[in-house]
Each structure stands twice: as structure tokens, then as C-alpha cells.
């Protein structure tokens, strides 16, 4: 059975592409028809592609890999954060900082600085420092949290990227390509599908569409995690019996 139904996709408006004058000819194979100057995406293909993406993300999770959710456009920011957190993964929903993947060691230094400032706030250091200095430090902490909060616990470069709107996330895609990190993405009719390993042809501007598809990718990770939670731990007796 498909991960997602045609009915769910229709209700979320996943089928609405961009205006016909704003399109990438490489997306032609995913277009069903044109209506009132707007391309309509072939949802039968979307259903199939969601299945492929879901299975890939599930595979990454089953091997203990990490997925970085990326969506900095307004319609994606809240969803990307919520779904990544729900799946116990990482996210970037503000500006992508150049070098986030290709220069992760430098980014890690900024993350360590953020953690240092958080610790200073927690252990009361801010209370004994001059007021002016505290204002400057808090400002720095807020800025670092804004851009790096979603990846501050990410142990290293992720094993896969999930992206909402590849046109918006050009730098993220270029960095992932350099490091051979596979990309899953919601790809609208104005995008280049050749840049993406797992294309999900869909409307990337409607909040409901973004939420539905991003939620399914989070579900793939949770399916693995819940499966692990349901595996009963071996008892001491079983371990001893196996040894004998």
C-alpha cells in the first residue's frame, strides 16, 4: 500500500504547480496537464516518488544515519522545525550559512560557542558580569541559536538532506553534491530535478502540501525508531542460554 493517498495529496493542494511561464522543461515528465495558466502535477507519479523517498529515508534511519531537514522559505520554516524535532533529527530553517557541510569544523566552533554561552546563562555567570557585557553576550547567543539551534546536537555531517524548494536552497545542494550526500526534495515545476537524488514532484508553496510531505519523511524515521523501541531486550537467562 502507498505511503500516501491521491486523496490526501489532492486535499493538500500538492498538484498545483507554478505558472506555465515559470517552469523548468526538465519537469515535463511530472506534469499532468495545464489549467488556467498553471501546471498541474501528475499525482500518480508523486505517490510513487513519495514511496521511493520514504523507503530511502527509512533505510538511512535504520542504519543509524542522520537526516538534516532544510527549508528556509516562509511556508516551510515552522514545518521543517516541527517535523525534524518530532523525528529526533536536525534542521535549518533560517539562512543557510555557507560551509555548514563543507566546512563543518568551523561551524562546530560556532556551535561550541553557543553551548558555552548557554552554560554561562544556566550556571549564573551572567548574573555576576556587568550588565552591558551580558546584553552583548545574550545578543550573540540569540543570533547563534537562530542560525545553529537546529544543528547544535548534530554529531557530524548528515547522511542525507531533505529539502523544501531546491531553487531556494542552492548553497545547501552545492555543498551536499561536493560531499556526495544524497538529497530528497520537494520539487516544484520551476525546479531542476536532475540535481536531486529522490525527487518528490509537488507544490512547494502551499503550507499544507509542505506539511503533509515533510511529515511523511519524519514518519519514515519514526517507523524505524518505534520498531527499535518495540524490540524486547534480551533477558540475562536468554543470554546465558545462548552462550551455552
Curated annotation (Swiss-Prot):
One of the Pfam families matching this protein, by short name: Ribosomal_S2
Organism domain of life: Bacteria
GO biological process assignments: translation
Keywords per UniProt: Ribonucleoprotein, Ribosomal protein
Family: Belongs to the universal ribosomal protein uS2 family.
One Gene Ontology molecular-function label: structural constituent of ribosome
Phylogenetic lineage: Bacteria, Bacillati, Bacillota, Bacilli, Bacillales
PROSITE patterns membership: RIBOSOMAL_S2_1, RIBOSOMAL_S2_2
Assigned GO CC terms: cytosolic small ribosomal subunit
HAMAP family the record matches: Ribosomal_uS2_B (MF_00291_B)
SUPFAM superfamilies registered for this protein in UniProt: Ribosomal protein S2
Gene: rpsB
Signal sequence bounds: none
Keyword presence, Ribosomal protein: yes
Name of the molecule in the record: Small ribosomal subunit protein uS2
Amino acid at each position: 500500500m502507498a505511503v500516501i493517498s491521491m486523496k490526501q495529496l489532492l486535499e493538500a493542494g500538492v498538484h498545483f504547480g507554478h505558472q506555465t511561464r515559470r517552469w523548468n522543461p526538465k519537469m515535463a515528465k511530472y506534469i499532468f496537464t495545464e489549467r488556467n495558466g498553471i501546471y498541474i502535477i501528475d499525482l500518480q507519479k508523486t505517490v510513487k516518488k513519495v514511496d521511493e523517498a520514504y523507503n530511502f529515508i527509512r533505510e538511512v534511519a535504520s542504519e543509524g544515519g542522520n537526516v538534516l531537514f532544510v527549508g528556509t522559505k516562509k511556508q516551510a520554516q515552522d514545518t521543517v522545525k516541527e517535523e525534524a524535532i518530532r523525528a529526533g533529527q536536525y534542521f535549518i530553517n533560517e539562512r543557510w550559512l555557507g560551509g555548514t557541510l563543507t566546512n563543518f569544523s568551523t561551524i562546530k566552533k560556532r556551535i561550541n560557542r553557543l553551548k558555552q554561552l548557554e552554560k554561562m546563562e544556566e550556571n549564573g555567570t551572567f548574573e555576576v558580569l556587568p550588565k552591558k557585557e551580558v546584553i552583548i553576550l545574550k545578543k550573540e547567543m540569540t543570533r547563534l541559536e537562530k542560525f545553529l539551534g537546529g544543528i547544535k546536537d548534530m554529531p557530524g555531517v548528515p547522511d542525507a538532506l531533505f529539502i523544501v524548494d531546491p531553487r531556494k536552497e542552492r548553497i545547501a545542494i552545492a555543498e551536499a553534491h561536493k560531499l556526495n550526500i544524497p538529497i530528497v526534495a520537494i520539487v516544484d515545476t520551476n525546479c531542476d530535478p536532475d540535481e536531486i537524488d529522490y525527487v518528490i514532484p509537488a507544490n512547494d508553496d502551499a503550507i499544507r502540501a509542505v506539511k503533509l510531505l515533510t511529515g511523511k519523511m519524519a514518519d519514515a524515521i519514526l517507523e524505524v525508531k518505534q520498531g527499535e523501541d518495540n524490540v524486547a531486550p534480551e533477558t540475562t537467562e536468554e543470554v546465558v542460554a545462548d552462550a551455552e
